Amino acid sequence: MIAADTNVLVRLLTDDDAAQSAIARSLFLAESIWISKTVLLETAWVLRSLYGFDEAAIRGAFGKLLGLKNVEMEGKPSVAAALDLNGRGIELADAMHLSGRPPGATFVSFDKALVRRARRAGVQGVSGPALTQ
């Protein structure tokens, strides 16, 4: 099994370096691949910041990776749930936080926009912190 780093995924998804992209493709064709959540998040950041990918393009690319039989992802069900939430208007990193929480846990954030987006998307158990003194 190969644990892929961000740069391997970026080469695979952008084909921006002919030699490295060919190696990345051959790895994905020949090996079992492990992808961590942190690598996914960093890959999303690189694709958005340096390559101009929008959320839909990133979601589509990650969805294809999820569907590959030889690819295992850390927390695969929560990654799939995060991609669904992302499609409903929640930023990918926030969606990963929401989908990765333990069952029944309330997600608390000072980010009022995130709380509103989560509620609009139908996510239960999301709130701002109760401020007491």
List the predicted regions and their residue ranges:
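Acidic, PIN/NYN-like endoribonuclease modules and their adjacent C-terminal/linker elements
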Residues: 68, 85, 98-99, 103-133
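Alpha-helix/helix-capping structural signal
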Residues: 7-8, 38, 112-113
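Short, well-structured N-terminal submotif of metal-dependent ribonuclease cores
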Residues: 1-35, 50-60, 121-133
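Acidic catalytic patch
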Residues: 37-40, 59-88, 116
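Alpha-helix C-terminal capping segments
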Residues: 24-31, 82-86, 97-104
